[in-house]
Amino acid sequence: MAGQKIRIRLKAYDHEAIDASAKKIVETVTRTGARVVGPVPLPTEKNVYAVIRSPHKYKDSREHFEMRTHKRLIDILDPTPKTVDALMRIDLPASVDVNIQ
């Protein structure tokens, strides 16, 4: 697998969970002998929702809620079969979305 690259994108609402998952991936990959670039923090996506406070009146009074999606990027250079096997066995929280390319 020389000259190849594995790109891992992580997404989560909780920044602590995504940082812990990224650290776990980096430690696992470095133990197998592959080179790691990252984790690179990508821009945080922020969705703001405005909801009317009253059930039927006072449209000017609104409450704002936001959801932040934190993203990280990890590149694995020159992965070995041992690296790929270790990545398949790694256990990450359900709140972290993992996309491997």
UniProtKB/Swiss-Prot annotation:
* Gene Ontology annotations for the cellular component aspect, listed alphabetically: ribonucleoprotein complex; ribosome
Provide the alphabetized UniProt keywords: Ribonucleoprotein, Ribosomal protein
> Domain of life here?
Bacteria
- Entries under InterPro entries matching the protein: Ribosomal_uS10 (IPR001848), Ribosomal_uS10_CS (IPR018268), Ribosomal_uS10_dom (IPR027486), Ribosomal_uS10_dom_sf (IPR036838)
Under Gene3D superfamilies, the record lists: Ribosomal protein S10 domain (3.30.70.600)
Set out the biological process GO terms recorded for this chain's protein.
Answer: translation
Q: Which GO terms describe its molecular function?
A: structural constituent of ribosome; tRNA binding
| Biological role | Involved in the binding of tRNA to the ribosomes.
| PANTHER family xrefs | 30S RIBOSOMAL PROTEIN S10 FAMILY MEMBER
Q: Which family does it belong to?
A: Belongs to the universal ribosomal protein uS10 family.
Quaternary structure, per UniProt, is: Part of the 30S ribosomal subunit.
What protein name is recorded for this chain?
Answer: Small ribosomal subunit protein uS10
Give the organism the record lists. Corynebacterium aurimucosum (strain ATCC 700975 / DSM 44827 / CIP 107346 / CN-1) (Corynebacterium nigricans)
Ranked from the top, the taxonomy reads: Bacteria, Bacillati, Actinomycetota, Actinomycetes, Mycobacteriales
